A protein has these predicted regions:
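Vicinal oxygen chelate
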Residues: 1-10, 14, 35-38, 86-128
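Core segments of cupin and vicinal oxygen chelate
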Residues: 3-7, 13-55
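Structural motif
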Residues: 9, 55-58, 72-74, 107
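A solvent-exposed interaction/effector surface
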Residues: 28, 64-65
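Short beta-strand micro-motifs in enzyme catalytic cores
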Residues: 43-45, 73-75, 106-110
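Active-site/binding-pocket entry motifs
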Residues: 53, 65-67
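Conserved beta-strand in the GNAT
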Residues: 58-61, 120-121
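Mid-chain, well-packed structural core segment of small domains
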Residues: 68-92
Length: 128
């Protein structure tokens, strides 16, 4: 594994109140299967990640001392075409804050909220 640059994100956690609802949303929008992680009393389900490759891993977390929603951090998920995932958001209980929009030479993004009110980004980078 290569040593990552110190300014890259190495892990993220999205705090949720209802894990079953959150898993349904994220697995449905992204067409993936989350994996259990850590002790059951914490309630963590992780997104797949490959160590040593571009991007980072993270997890949904349900913990009584950490409320969901209302923070100022946005996690952006890479998508081949963010309009595809954007169309799935309402089907799985989320809402669209800003539909697919250009961010110039950096591609396109959609801003959405999951069922717990967490703001997430769907990012389609421009490929050379």
């Amino acid at each position: 594994m290569n040593t990552p640059a110190m300014n890259t994100v190495g892990w993220f956690e999205i705090y949720v109140q209802d894990m079953a609802r959150a898993r349904h949303f994220y697995e449905g929008v992204f067409g993936c299967e989350l994996q259990p992680l850590g002790p059951p009393e914490v309630g963590m389900w992780s997104f797949a990640s490959a160590l040593g490759q571009y991007g980072c891993g993270g997890a949904l977390v349900s913990h009584p001392t950490m409320p969901s929603g209302g923070n100022s951090t946005v996690v952006y998920f890479f998508c081949a075409d963010c309009a595809v995932e954007e169309a799935r958001v309402p089907k799985f209980g989320g809402t669209i804050e800003r539909p697919k929009m250009s961010i110039g030479p950096f591609g396109h993004v959609t801003l959405a909220r999951d069922p717990d009110g967490n703001l997430i980004g769907l990012h389609t980078p421009l490929m050379p």
